[in-house]
Regions:
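Mg2+/Mn2+-dependent nuclease catalytic core
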Residues: 133-234
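Metal-dependent nuclease catalytic cores that hydrolyze phosphodiester bonds in DNA/RNA
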Residues: 1-147
């Protein structure tokens, strides 16, 4: 569960008392240079207003203090530019890969087949094995009061021994704009000490703390690239 600020509410591993934990994404967003992402968002607002004359007319009618109305115009402009459609498709593809990794009997729609095939082939080509028991797990780093949800753990060559943190990304420009933020997140996950299973804490399995993987599977492109990320600085 979360508090009103979006922080995880979880027991402290030492005291057992519930407390808020800062999200790993919040820490990463604060430390990372988000200029590229912010510029992308601004461009989408411009494109959305250009596509919707009614939004332009509404904007002209507003005064600077009409903040609520202006915020609604921005949201509508982003929708008009389909700024979030890629994210929705990416979420769907992400969930499909999770089901594939769990070995579920899944009838994959034709629209996703090339992407899923590319993902599976990339794992084979790089000798990677996803541990289905270690996907979407909440981990905590008590020293800094941080919690987050790691995407998946993988093994290189064969299951067992040291695992490596992996994060599947489906955005088009994630490697171009978001790698600093992602590296910070992955460093947090790799240095976490406890795993919350919904009832109690488990110990974090042994993972590499100097490297992690970004699995880039851009929606609709039928290709998948795996990038090794240096997370030692995190």
């Amino acid at each position: 569960k979360f508090d009103q600020y979006g922080r995880y509410i979880l027991p402290d591993p030492e005291t057992g008392e519930e407390r808020p934990w800062t999200r790993a994404t919040t820490v990463a967003n604060t430390l990372a240079d988000r200029r590229g992402l912010e510029q992308w968002a601004k461009r989408n607002v411009v494109l959305g207003i250009a596509a919707r004359p009614d939004l332009y007319a509404l904007a002209v009618s507003c005064k600077p203090e009409d903040k609520d109305q202006l915020n609604r115009i921005v949201a509508d402009a982003e929708e008009a530019a389909k700024a979030h459609s890629g994210a929705n498709l990416g979420t769907a593809l992400h969930r499909i890969t999770e089901r594939v990794d769990r070995g579920e009997d899944l009838d994959i729609p034709d629209a996703w087949r090339a992407d899923v095939d590319a993902y599976c082939q990339a794992l084979v080509d790089n000798h990677l094995i996803v541990d289905p028991d270690w996907m979407e797990r909440i981990v905590v780093l008590p020293e800094y009061g941080i919690a987050g949800t790691l995407d998946r753990l993988l093994y290189i060559g064969k299951k067992g021994g040291m695992a490596i943190i992996g994060d599947l990304k489906t955005g088009q420009d994630v490697v171009r704009y978001g790698m600093t933020e992602i590296a910070i997140q992955l460093a947090i996950y790799a240095n976490a000490t406890h795993v919350w299973n919904g009832v109690d804490y488990e110990k974090m399995p042994p993972v590499y703390t100097d490297r992690a993987l970004v699995i880039h599977l851009p929606v609709g492109q039928g290709r998948c690239e795996i990038h090794q990320v240096d997370i030692r600085a995190g």
